[in-house]
């Protein structure tokens, strides 16, 4: 496996492309925002003029797109990925989508004789850029093993979860835990502030306690400083919470904590923080507590 195509060069796509380039892969990238691609060209990325151009001549293609609707169009639309990719190219779907959509893509790929894997990655773009994160994989193990060199170049860990769709289940579960943990941290810091304890001091104390976590290390300083440079944009987490609730509705089950998290993120996005990090949810909790106007 030598040449990789990437469709979608946003925060996460940039991190993935950078990891592959650093490990000696040839990488062709396409994004609807050309400036995203040009920024990586200085590091050796081949600038693709279209999604089809990014796919041409590749051993594997990753799609790293923002919403399920975009994923569906790129994969299943007229002239989409399943129609244009060569039969030998491994097709790897890395976006956060519903398990149902992942299975639809897998079935459509199988009907066309294409090799497909459900490969969402758990971890922020910052973590992935440093070689962290975990890739969850759903699909045939033989295809998984063939693509392992690319997975190993991108992430610190890769887990074969099961058939197509199971990796997307794992990704939604991971995001549920990570998102609610971040909101719980924000709520704790607001409780402390209301009691008169400076957020920085409370964060320092919590960081030395049994509740210390990676979420605390990553998002705690953002909450304390109110500088919300995005590791993952809040609007993307809002989309993911919505996917969790959609899946829960399909299964006929409640997700009460996720429902509250979705509402808090909706309010925070409406207040203008959608393009900032999920940590910005603390601003809504502060407003509700009467700490900030």
Question: Model regions: which residues?
Answer:
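NAD(P)+-binding Rossmann beta1-loop-alpha1 motif at the extreme N-terminus of oxidoreductases
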Residues: 1-64, 89, 94, 125
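Rossmann-fold dinucleotide-binding core
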Residues: 4, 9, 96-179
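Hydrophobic beta-strand scaffold residues
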Residues: 27, 47, 116-117, 158, ...
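Rossmann-fold NAD(P) dinucleotide-binding segment
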Residues: 51-114
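Active-site-proximal catalytic alpha-helix in oxidoreductases
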Residues: 131, 135-138, 159, 163-195, ...
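Interdomain hinge/lid region at the active-site interface
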Residues: 164, 168, 212-277
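NAD(P)-dependent dehydrogenase/reductase Rossmann-like domain
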Residues: 270-293
């Amino acid at each position: 496996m030598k040449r990789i195509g990437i469709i979608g060069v946003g925060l996460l796509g940039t991190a993935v492309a950078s990891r592959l380039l650093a490990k000696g892969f040839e990488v062709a990238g396409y994004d609807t925002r050309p400036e995203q691609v040009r920024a990586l060209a200085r590091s050796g990325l081949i600038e693709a003029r279209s999604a089809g151009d990014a796919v041409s001549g590749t051993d594997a293609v990753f799609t790293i797109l923002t919403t399920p609707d975009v994923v569906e169009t790129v994969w299943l639309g007229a002239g989409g990925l399943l129609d244009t990719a060569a039969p030998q190219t491994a097709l790897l779907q890395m976006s956060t989508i519903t398990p149902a959509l992942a299975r639809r893509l897998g079935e459509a790929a199988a009907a066309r004789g294409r090799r497909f894997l459900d490969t969402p990655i758990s971890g922020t773009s910052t973590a992935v850029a440093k070689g962290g994160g975990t890739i969850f994989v759903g699909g045939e193990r033989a295809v998984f093993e063939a693509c392992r060199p690319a997975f190993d170049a991108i992430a610190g860990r890769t887990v074969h979860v099961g058939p197509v769709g199971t990796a997307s289940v794992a990704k939604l579960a991971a995001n549920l835990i990570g998102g609610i943990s971040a909101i719980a941290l924000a709520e704790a810091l607001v409780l402390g502030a209301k009691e008169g304890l400076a957020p920085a001091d409370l964060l320092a104390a919590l960081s030395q306690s049994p509740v210390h976590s990676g979420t605390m290390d990553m998002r705690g300083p953002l909450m304390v400083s109110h500088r919300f440079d995005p590791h993952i944009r809040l609007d993307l987490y809002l989309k993911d919470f919505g996917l969790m609730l959609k899946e829960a509705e399909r299964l006929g089950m409640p997700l009460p904590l996720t429902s509250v998290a979705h509402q808090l993120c909706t309010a925070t996005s409406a207040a203008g923080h959608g393009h900032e990090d999920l940590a910005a949810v603390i601003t809504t909790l502060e407003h509700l507590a009467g700490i900030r106007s």
